[in-house]
Amino acid sequence: MDKTLIKELLADHSRNPRNYGTLTDPDAEHETSNPQCVGPTHPEGDEVALTVELSEETPPVVEAVQFTGRGCTLSQASASLLTEQMIGTPVEEVVEWDSETLEDLVGMDLTPSRLKCAELALVAFRNAVEER
């Protein structure tokens, strides 16, 4: 994907996040942060809180997912992009997503420090379903 298009996609998802909010009666939820990524709008680091609704079938499928958070463009855009992809996907498949999945989703290679930003929503999802 063209670098300009990637920047536009990430900026759009950061400014107009999809699935932003909190589910009223989630089956699973978790909040996580990356204190190493600080900025003027997020002096304590990136934060993502995820709420998830799962199907009753076996294996369960993600029926709904919403997030709230603050942080760098990459962390918030990735949370938006990830939640779009999670809906309708079996939980066991989502927990297997890795850095390659994230890089494909955001359209670029990620350094280890940027990967920590991009994976916040995925880490929150894994912890949420593990804790339920």
List the model feature ranges, each with a label:
Residues 78-89:
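Alpha-helical support elements that line or immediately flank enzyme active sites
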Residues 12, 39, 49-50:
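Structured surface interface patches that mediate subunit assembly and partner/cofactor docking
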Residues 1-33, 55-57, 61-64, 89-132:
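C-terminal binding/interaction regions
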Residues 46-56:
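Short beta-strand elements
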Residues 45-47, 60-62, 77:
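Short connector loops at helix/strand junctions that flank enzyme active sites
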Residues 43-44, 69-76:
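Short, thiol/selenol-centered motifs that function as redox-active sites or metal-ligating centers
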Residues 74-79, 117-120:
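Catalytic-loop motifs flanking and including active-site residues across diverse enzymes
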